[in-house]
Amino acid sequence: MTTETFVKDIKPGLKNLNLIFIVLETGRVTKTKDGHEVRTCKVADKTGSINISVWDDVGNLIQPGDIIRLTKGYASVFKGCLTLYTGRGGDLQKIGEFCMVYSEVPNFSEPNPEYSAQQAPNKTVQNDSGPAAPQPPTGPPATSPASESQNGNGLSAPPGSGGGPHPPHTPSHPPSTRITRSQPNHTAAGPPGPSNNPVSNGKETRRSSKR
């Protein structure tokens, strides 16, 4: 007597599986490089659904609604999805049609997050190593502007020695201009003085000449 396995109990790597299921859907035929025809069918029992890969003529005979007994099958992961296969010496036998209790949910052939989780850390490590490379270039530019600003100040310092006095001269110029403005006022008062002197001198010379 062979023990039957339910769809919910199928795990990757299990062999010598014996199941009874009903065919829900038949997929498109794909041809391999060796010329074999492969068809993926969706089957189910009362515990859930799963995909089974059927080869060559057997796939052409299977129709939706067929109740089939699988003997000596095995389970494997294909493209991240759990899939049933007919092993060596295995067989698919039609034992009825339509009258079977089944459930499409859960679908055990959906992508398993555990496999994607195993691939995710590898990608994240690569991504982490990727941004680490651009970080060093960002460091030097940050230091370069500071150094450039310091160098600019340093370079301005030598002219700044001339430029350093300029800012003090600039405040000195406004007072000097004020002084010049005040000077013309003083000079305005001044010219009558010197003008009187030459006039007095002229008179004295004239008087001296008359004398």
Swiss-Prot record:
Keyword Disulfide bond on entry: no
UniProt DNA-binding region: 22-92
Region (Disordered), start-end ranges: 110-211
Main location: nucleus
Coiled-coil region list: none
Gene Ontology terms, MF aspect: DNA binding; single-stranded DNA binding
Keyword DNA-binding recorded: yes
Origin superkingdom: Eukaryota
Residue stretches of biased makeup (Polar residues): 115-128
Membrane-spanning parts: none
Free-text function comment from the UniProt entry: Component of the SOSS complex, a multiprotein complex that functions downstream of the MRN complex to promote DNA repair and G2/M checkpoint. In the SOSS complex, acts as a sensor of single-stranded DNA that binds to single-stranded DNA, in particular to polypyrimidines. The SOSS complex associates with DNA lesions and influences diverse endpoints in the cellular DNA damage response including cell-cycle checkpoint activation, recombinational repair and maintenance of genomic stability.
Complex formation: Component of the SOSS complex, composed of SOSS-B (SOSS-B1/NABP2 or SOSS-B2/NABP1), SOSS-A/INTS3 and SOSS-C/INIP. SOSS complexes containing SOSS-B1/NABP2 are more abundant than complexes containing SOSS-B2/NABP1. Directly interacts with ATM, SOSS-A/INTS3 and RAD51. Interacts with INTS7.
Similarity annotation: Belongs to the SOSS-B family. SOSS-B1 subfamily.
The protein's name in its UniProt record: SOSS complex subunit B1
Source organism: Bos taurus (Bovine)
Gene that this polypeptide is encoded by: NABP2
